[in-house]
Amino acid sequence: QGGTLVRHYKELAYMGFIPVLLHLRTILHNMKACKRDVLEWNPDVLILVDYPGFNLSVAEFVHAHSPIPVYYYISPKIWAWKEYRIKNIKRDVDELFSILPFEVDFFEGKHHYPIHYVGNPTLDEVEAYKRENEKDFGRFAEDNGLEGKPVLALLAGSRKQEIKDNLPMMVEAASVYEGQYELVLAAAPNIDPEFYGKVLR
């Protein structure tokens, strides 16, 4: 609210080698438009959110071509892969904001780069929901055919491509716990439930 939407993130959200290759022209066009818009609008600060494959390139461009400070919310997961990107982050990002508490030790302890832990909105939402609905779990279990065992939730993502890529392997890996846990697929609100069935057939 209160902003001007130039591109929807769905136009940029491609995962995997083949989808990126097939949409490379669109990705490059959007990248060029984004860089041009930032320089034309000349904001007081540029706030980049997640999506490091795209946003770190934008940060590099803005740092090289303007004095605009670059803030990055949801820090790139360089502790998981491509740790060498810390050099680019140190060079191109003025302030880094994390939603994972352990990242403070990783960035500040290992790489001597200051980072702000700002809490995790998803975790806060889950905790609030649990407090408000603690007494309703029995009804939830009954409505969903759960038998009272601990729940193992499969969170395959919120984009169709990542669900197609991840869900079959997740189900296979989780199946070894079937006797000990209730396996529950947490569906993304923006994905038609039928899509999950098609992926798992």
Sequence positions of predicted segments:
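Short beta-strand segments at enzyme active-site cores
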Residues: 48, 152, 184-186
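Active-site and donor-binding regions of nucleotide-sugar-utilizing enzymes
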Residues: 1-141, 155-162, 177, 190-191
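Charged active-site motifs of nucleotide-sugar-dependent glycosyltransferases
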Residues: 146-153, 181-182
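Nucleotide-activated donor-binding/catalytic signature segment of Leloir-type glycosyltransferases, i.e.
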Residues: 197-201
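Conserved catalytic-core segment of nucleotide-activated headgroup transferases in glycan assembly
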Residues: 158-186
